[in-house]
UniProtKB/Swiss-Prot annotation:
EC number: 2.8.1.-
Molecular function terms, GO-annotated: 4 iron, 4 sulfur cluster binding; ATP binding; magnesium ion binding; sulfurtransferase activity; tRNA binding
Catalytic reactions on record: cytidine(32) in tRNA + S-sulfanyl-L-cysteinyl-[cysteine desulfurase] + AH2 + ATP = 2-thiocytidine(32) in tRNA + L-cysteinyl-[cysteine desulfurase] + A + AMP + diphosphate + H(+)
Pathway: tRNA modification
Note: The thiolation reaction likely consists of two steps: a first activation step by ATP to form an adenylated intermediate of the target base of tRNA, and a second nucleophilic substitution step of the sulfur (S) atom supplied by the hydrosulfide attached to the Fe-S cluster.
Family: Belongs to the TtcA family.
Function recorded in the entry: Catalyzes the ATP-dependent 2-thiolation of cytidine in position 32 of tRNA, to form 2-thiocytidine (s(2)C32). The sulfur atoms are provided by the cysteine/cysteine desulfurase (IscS) system.
Record protein name field: tRNA-cytidine(32) 2-sulfurtransferase
Taxonomic lineage: Bacteria, Pseudomonadati, Pseudomonadota, Alphaproteobacteria, Hyphomicrobiales
Localization annotation: Cytoplasm
GO cellular component: cytoplasm
One of the GO BP terms on file: tRNA thio-modification
Length: 292
């Protein structure tokens, strides 16, 4: 059996649970939700070969529902013996006005979760370089990424783990399709340019609605994402609205879209760098690919 085996029963470790879950009402509905999220997280970890036993992962914690959910699910898997890595929760306080500095340390200390809180006033840098009417998210995220890479190296972590979910990936795909003229989304596993750190997204298969329900049931102390007064651009909001409308009209399409990303056929696209169209030759055997 592998150190990380997706066939291990869902109820492994049912004689106990991580302290995070001890005060949560164990309703049938919540148990189903928790098992579904655990299953999807484990599936993504296995599908994209994220685990190397003994490594140290840096789990980025912003105070939003997704990062709280990510941390809780990884701790749950580790508690059950299904995730043989060390976990370090890291929050980067970027100096946003009115940021409640006590919430995350109080939460992490309460449950004895290993963590690091890092203060770097990138907010002042962003507001100094951009006009007030600008959307700060792009520059802010670049500055955040640089600091997270530095912290991961200082802490001896081999991977930075982010809480992007199914909808984040789909929205990015359609933003690139409609506005960038390319087929690309958020990769579930990425090697940084320097080649010394991996970036993982174990929630790639998880639905945002499920993570929201999970956060509510777990009573996470959510920190608002709009403290800086800047909201993410209209393009992503438009993609989110479009996907919501599609899912409402045709339930299950989001899952179908995610499956499509795992089933790419370069011979049925137009990218000559991915498929050798010039090399196609008549061979008289009738065994070529078939258009559908």
């Amino acid at each position: 059996m592998n150190a990380f085996d997706p066939d291990i029963a869902e109820d492994a470790g049912s004689d106990g649970c991580h302290p995070l879950f001890r005060d949560v009402p164990t309703t049938v509905e919540f148990n189903k939700l928790r098992k579904r999220l655990l299953r999807l997280t484990r599936q993504a970890i296995e599908d994209f070969s994220m685990v190397k036993p003994g490594e140290r992962w840096m789990v980025c914690l912003s105070g939003g529902k997704d990062s709280y959910g990510l941390l809780a699910l990884l701790l749950d898997l580790k508690w059950r013996g299904l995730l043989p890595v060390e976990l370090l929760a890291v929050n980067l306080d970027q100096g946003q006005p009115n940021f409640p500095k006590h919430i995350l340390p109080d939460f992490l200390n309460r449950y004895e979760i290993e963590h690091r809180i890092e203060y770097q006033d990138t907010y002042s840098i962003v507001t100094d370089k951009l006009p007030e009417t600008s959307t700060y998210c792009s520059l802010c995220s670049r500055l955040r990424r640089g600091n997270l890479y530095r912290i991961a190296r200082e802490e001896g972590c081999s991977a930075i783990v982010l809480g992007h979910h199914r909808e984040d990936i789909l929205e990015t795909f359609f933003m690139n399709l409609f506005h960038g003229g390319r087929l690309a989304a958020m990769p579930p596993k990425l090697l940084n340019d320097e080649g010394d750190l991996m970036v993982f997204r174990p929630l790639a298969y998880a639905a945002e609605d499920d993570l929201e329900k999970f956060a509510t049931a777990m009573q996470f102390p959510i920190i608002p994402c709009d403290l800086c007064g800047s909201q993410e651009g209209l393009q992503r909001n438009a993609m989110k609205a479009m996907l919501t409308d599609i899912e409402k009209r045709m339930p299950g399409r989001k899952d179908t879209m995610i499956r499509a990303m795992t089933n790419v056929r370069p011979s049925h696209l137009l990218d000559r760098k991915l498929f050798d169209f010039a090399g196609l030759m008549l061979n008289g055997e009738g065994e070529g690919d078939h258009a559908v």
